[in-house]
Amino acid sequence: MQSVRQTVLFESEEAWRAGAEQNATAITVHARGGEVVQTRRTWAAAGGPRVRVTWSGGRTVSEVSPQLAAGLSVYVEGGAHVSRDFVQARGQAVFHSAQLELDAVRAWWPRELAVQPEALRWAECAYDIELGRQVRVDEYCALRAGETVALTAAAGGTDEAKVETGVFYPEISDGADVSLSGFRCTWLRDGSGRTDTCQKTLLMYKPAHVHMPEPAVGIELVQPVTLHPVIEVDLSSVSASGPACAHHVFLQLPAQLFVDKFQQPPELLFGEDDLELPEYKVEAWGSEVIYALEPGRVNRVQLHSRYARPGPGRRYEVVPLRPYVFEACDTGSADIAENPFYSKGMGFEAYFTADTVFKHRNSTRLNIPVPRGNSNDFPSIQYVTVLSILFSVLYISYCLFRRPVAASARASG
């Protein structure tokens, strides 16, 4: 049986009072823009390996959502029985793609479920999905200004489904504690579509992910961009929040890019680290890298481009990359691991302790141009090469045969 929980998070009490209406059959939300709707669907499953699938277009962190890596990421606990596309990391195997690849999701999705990956709203929303003994699909959608959404019992899909809806605003959100105030309703399971009970609700918990936009942290690509791109992370105006805190940058590098662990040793590096292989010889999707950053200064991360297989037309391939700059703080609190809306698990969170709070500073998208040979130039390159070889042979022959003639002329004189 499916259970569905819908949560709407307003930015303030004022927006909550003005934007939420409730009657016997629906909760209607009138958005000002920026409201987050989390829909959690849960089913029992036959079992299998524990897998986490995430999909995001950028920044997702809020009081009810963690920070998900941009693009598609698939994490398999233990890392056994995965294809060569995966990277073996600490306690997990990882697959990543900047684009949505539904085949990578279908490979782990239970076939018996009524809802299949094609039915999800990939183009509009972010997803945090857990597969295994149960299937849990957390959908995060941001509402646009002027958008109106009606939340009803129909979200359950069937009359037997358990449906719960909550509408909240943050009463306290200071980075250490979150207190959400609002109301929540349950729905009758008799096909009437009417609410069962509604009650005021106060939720208090400690978040594992916090958005920290101030002080500003800049992420830039040093110009001009060469075969060895350099990323600058400006932490000049930033200091550590405490003795148990440290700043890091997390990178998911596609096959076109890599780091030299000998030139600039990272804290963690999983995946393709061969310094000589061209892109088309790399088997896995790329690598995951974490570097320690020093607050109070501009930090540089040195990348390198792999030689790419030539193709028609393009002289450069633009590779998107989104570095995640965050401060990781050990708290000593067991309450950090999970809260009513998300729990820490696989992903970059697995590289830190269970009591770590992630304070996210910036995640600017960078577009890195990687040189790629133009196969349309092959005929002209071959023509010039042949001419150069012929000219070289003629010139060398001329020099070899000219010297004896000149010497004999001097001798006869």
Swiss-Prot record:
GO terms for biological process: GPI anchor biosynthetic process. It is found in: Endoplasmic reticulum membrane. GO terms for cellular component: endoplasmic reticulum membrane; glycosylphosphatidylinositol-mannosyltransferase I complex. Pfam families: PIG-X. Residues 402-413 are cytoplasmic. The chain crosses the membrane at residues 379-401. Residues 1-378 are lumenal. Pathway: Glycolipid biosynthesis; glycosylphosphatidylinositol-anchor biosynthesis. Glycans are attached at residue 362. It is a single-pass type III membrane protein. Keywords: Endoplasmic reticulum, Glycoprotein, GPI-anchor biosynthesis, Membrane, Transmembrane, Transmembrane helix. Belongs to the PIGX family. This is Protein PBN1. It comes from Eremothecium gossypii (strain ATCC 10895 / CBS 109.51 / FGSC 9923 / NRRL Y-1056) (Yeast). The lineage of its organism: Eukaryota, Fungi, Dikarya, Ascomycota, Saccharomycotina. The gene is PBN1.
